Amino acid sequence: MSYPDDYSTDIEKNKMDLKEFKEKTQIAELESKVLRLELKNKDVTRENVQIKKENEILKRELDKLRIPPLILGTILDKVNERKAVVKSSTGPNFLVNLSQFVDPEDIVPGARVCLNQQTLAIVEVLPKEKDYRAMAMEIEEKPDISFEDIGGLNNQIRDIKEVVELPLKNPELFEKVGIVPPKGVLLYGPPGTGKTLLAKAVAYETNASFVRVVGSELVKKFIGEGAKLVRDVFKLAKEKSPCIIFIDEIDAVASKRTESLTGGDREVQRTLMQLLAEMDGFDSRGDVKIIAATNRPDILDPAILRPGRFDRIIEISMPDEDGRLEILKIHTEKMNLKNVDLREVAKLAENMVGADLKAVCTEAGMFAIREEREFIKMDDFKEAISKITGKKEKCSYDMPQLTVMYG
C-alpha cells in the first residue's frame, strides 16, 4: 500500500519534531538536575567550612586541656633583667629565668607569677590578688535616699557635707584656702536617729564609689585574716577613688584595748591596729573618705578618735519638736490624711526618734486598714503612739544604760 508524498513528508516531519522535543526535554531535565546539584554542592561546601571552623575550635580547646598546669609563685627579689628569686607555692625558693614574653618591668617583689613545671621559668605575671570579700562590699546600685528625705538633722547634714561631699565635688576650695580636706567623720547617737540613713544619703548625693563594711565583718577567726581584709578594703577603695568607706557599728572592731590575754581579743586588737594604720599611717590614704557609725562612743579606743582619722565627730541626737515635725512630714507625704494636725502628733511623740516616728506612721495606716477606711485620722496616730510607747516601756530595762551614755 502506497501513501501520498505529502502524507509521508508530514510523518517524517512529526518524527523529527518528536525527536527534537525529547532532546529538549532531556536537556531541560539535565539542566535542572545540574542546578540542583550545584545548590547542593554549595550547601555541602558551606557545611564543610562550618565543620572545619568547629574542628579548629575543638582542636584549640583540646590543646589547652593538654597543657600542663603552671606553678604559682611570688617574686622575692629581682637579680637582673632576666633572672629573679621566686618562692614557689610548693615551698622552696628558686633562682629562675624570665620568659621572653614577660616584661622585666612587671617583675617586682611581691608580684604573683606563673612558673613552668619543668624549667620553673617565669612564663606569666598575674594581676594583684584581691579578696573576694572586700570586692563584695562595694555597692553597685546606690540607695535612693537623698538629704531631702532626712528630717530634723539640718546641722548634721551641713557638717557631713563639709567633710565628705564638698572635698569630692569642689577640692579647689581647699587648695585656695591652703588646708588639707578632712578625711573622716564619726556619727554617734542613740539607735534609730538616722546615722545609717545619713550614710545612704551621702552615697546617693556623690558620684564616688561606695564601700559598706559592718564592723563585725572585720573580726575573723584566724590570725591575720581580719587585718588582711582591712588592707584589701582600703586597697579596693584606693583603686576605686574617689571612694567613700562606710563602717557601720565600728565599736565591734574599735573598742578600747585592754590587758585581756584571750586569743579572740588579741585578734580584734590586731585588726584595730591595722585599721588605725590604714586610716592615718605611713602611706597616704589618697582620695578616700571614711564615715563610721556607732551607738556606743564611750567604748571606742581613744586612738581612733583623734584628728587625722576622724576629723569631725558628729552627734546624731534625739530630735526636738520641730525635728519630729519635719520627720513626720517626710513619712506622711504620700499618706491619705484627713483632719490630722502633725504639730500635735509631734508634741505627743515626745522622746521618739526617727525610726519610732516611721513606725508610728505605719501603725496609724494599719489602724485605718483594720477599720476598712481609705484615709488616716488623728485618732489613728494617737493609738499608734500609745502602741509604740507601750513597746518601748516593756523594754525599759535597757534604757538606763542609754540614758547614762547620752545624758
Curated annotation (Swiss-Prot):
It comes from the Archaea. Keywords: ATP-binding, Chaperone, Coiled coil, Cytoplasm, Nucleotide-binding, Proteasome. Residues 405-407 are annotated as: Docks into pockets in the proteasome alpha-ring to cause gate opening. Residues 22-67 form a coiled coil. Pfam families: AAA, AAA_lid_3, Prot_ATP_ID_OB_C. It is found in: Cytoplasm. Homohexamer. The hexameric complex has a two-ring architecture resembling a top hat that caps the 20S proteasome core at one or both ends. Upon ATP-binding, the C-terminus of PAN interacts with the alpha-rings of the proteasome core by binding to the intersubunit pockets. Belongs to the AAA ATPase family. This is Proteasome-activating nucleotidase. It comes from Methanococcus maripaludis (strain C7 / ATCC BAA-1331). The gene is pan.
